[in-house]
């Protein structure tokens, strides 16, 4: 748990990551339910710029690659999981939604972090399935992930300060929430 007094004392009154040169270009997820993949790849891109000196204007990781392998297993060189399947078919992965847990688990297995040029995200039509061997074709690998669970009763100011502190400490956060369709319209 983050100490609120400490968090408030280390958070500047104003911060703009664009001025620091950390933010890559804004991307459009189109009509697909891949916001979770965009959030995670964006956080990876910011980390790459901030921590390993990547250039914000030139880094572009594939949201499609992460989303695809979030629902489809890649090739397992040890042959422990090559016959594993998900209940979601390959053509459902962009419409099914997801969350940070799904994405981080895939990234911990070195799936994702691939180059956008190799696996472009298409907003006009559902793209073809990827080869299983493409799962580990990564440009960047996840080293660490930090998770903070906010309970419903979490004080709003505390939650805001925790997120601000994490942005200052790690450069970016990826955020997931559940939106039930019955609350739309």
Residue locations for each model-derived region?
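A short, polar/charged loop/turn motif at coil->beta-strand junctions and beta-hairpin connectors
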Residues: 9-13, 60, 169
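A short glycine/serine-rich beta->alpha loop
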Residues: 22-32, 89-93
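Short, conserved catalytic-motif segment at the N-terminal edge
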Residues: 13-25
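Predominantly the structural core of cysteine protease catalytic domains
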Residues: 16-17, 36-45, 65-185
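Alpha-helical support elements that line or immediately flank enzyme active sites
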Residues: 29-53
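N-terminal zymogen propeptides
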Residues: 1-16
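Hydrophobic aliphatic residue packing
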Residues: 23-26, 49, 163, 173
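Short, well-structured active-site flanking segments
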Residues: 48-64
């Amino acid at each position: 748990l983050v100490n609120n007094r400490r968090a408030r004392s280390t958070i500047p009154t104003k911060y703009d990551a664009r001025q620091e040169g950390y933010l890559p270009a804004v991307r459009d997820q189109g009509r697909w339910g891949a916001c979770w993949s965009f959030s995670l790849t964006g956080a990876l891109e910011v980390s790459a710029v901030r921590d390993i000196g990547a250039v914000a204007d030139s880094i572009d990781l594939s949201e499609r690659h992460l989303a695809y392998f979030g629902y489809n297993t890649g090739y397992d060189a040890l042959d422990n999981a090559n016959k594993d399947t998900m209940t979601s078919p390959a053509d459902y992965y962009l419409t099914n939604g997801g969350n940070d847990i799904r994405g981080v688990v895939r990234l911990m297995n070195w799936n994702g972090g691939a180059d956008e040029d190799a696996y472009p995200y298409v907003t006009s039509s559902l793209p073809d399935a990827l080869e299983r061997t493409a799962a580990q074709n990564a440009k960047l690998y996840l080293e660490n992930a930090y998770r903070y669970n906010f309970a419903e009763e979490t004080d709003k100011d505390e939650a805001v300060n925790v997120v601000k502190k994490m942005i200052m400490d790690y450069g970016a956060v990826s955020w997931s929430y559940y939106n039930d369709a019955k609350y739309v319209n």
